[in-house]
């Protein structure tokens, strides 16, 4: 049967598709649920002074898990790394569920970050190697939906579990999902073969990943020290410690928006960071500035998640209809719509709630278009033996950039308040920073060459080609 007439849930792909969706849902639910239960964790474990490290440790460990495993996959395939990543993530869940003090909890978050970063990189690789180009838009749309659904339900469900029983059951509850995911995914993962290539040495890449982690950690610590002089000094040192390894770990030209793969990664990292950070500050603006309840704020944010889910499904059908010829324009359109949505959020302190909901719906449509399509385009430009590295780059763009941008946004609020500005004014400045990022993302999206987006031979299922 031709791939044009197959579904991601046809017998050939059913087990792998369900396994991928469950893996993404488990990681997404765990990450978003911790946001809700973190105050309870810190209170019960007498660790309020270490509250921020519940999140920072996860991010820093995720950097290592994401970047290191990509090169391992390109040498050995994704089956073994996926197995070890699952075990690390499960160990982190068990350690968190049984943690007796805050230091054990922080250690468990490190294990979870390592496992989650490696797992998602393996999932992206499986998508590249298993699905033909004609189905990648659909599976990446399902991937996005599997992550968005926890954002709609995860915080509420986690809060309910914590209120009725204990926050520890949130971690225990994810384990069965991971077991089912492993049973469905691993047989398909073991069949995947990669063409071994040369490239950067694993040892060098590992050291660069560690340097990036240390630089990012110092940068995040420095942000919490602002506006003191030490905060600026450490922040500058941390920034240098981030930029130097980034130049080695990412495709050459990513930081300067070079045409092709570098522009794809820059576009994706910037628009996803702007979206994720805006959502965080939107909730703060709605509750503390507009005075609505947390549940009402959650519904407004959920409107973006809902439109994301819908358009992520629809874009897969569009991709099949035009055989991928409209991918470039869909990315540009998606980022442009996201810019409109963020611009509306910029005026949240003064616009009506109905307008805020409309802005969220528009932003959801934008991210629902740009996110899955940028992944499809990235894989279409990946040469044989490079699926693992491309997967690591995509996962890196989805996790590292938002984490850093959220930290910068938080420091903007701190500096503005230290300067005597109101919370409302500080939020406007932070949203302005997000608008700047999305404008740069629009510029980068125009540098994704339409000629490079079509595969040279779309009938070669699952084998991407290098486009010169």
Tell where the protein language model's regions lie, with residue ranges.
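Intrinsic disorder in cytosolic terminal tails and internal cytosolic loops
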Residues: 1-12, 194-198, 446-468
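Extracellular/periplasmic helix-loop-helix junction of adjacent transmembrane segments
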Residues: 37-63
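Helix-loop-helix hairpins in multi-pass membrane proteins, especially solute transporters
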Residues: 70-203
